């Protein structure tokens, strides 16, 4: 029975160590990404907009179009953008 506990303990330790290593790698990558945003900002690019562009590029085209349509509807309802002209108005 002691041998089974030893094996489980070793497996648990291995999982924990792998997770810790991956967490450290994740932190390193996050720091690298932060540095790239800083570099882009120093060259005159807006980091907030860069993040938005990356977010948009991750989306499926249909999903993005649907979200843009909903956003336009909300903005029109609030009077923040003019309502789209209908074909009848032309």
From Swiss-Prot:
Disulfide bonds: none annotated. It comes from the Bacteria. InterPro entries: GapR-like, GapR-like_DNA-bd. Signal peptide: none annotated. Pfam families: GapR_DNA-bd. GO terms for molecular function: DNA binding. Belongs to the UPF0335 family. NCBIfam families: PRK13694.1 (NF010247). HAMAP family: UPF0335. This is UPF0335 protein Smed_2680. It comes from Sinorhizobium medicae (strain WSM419).
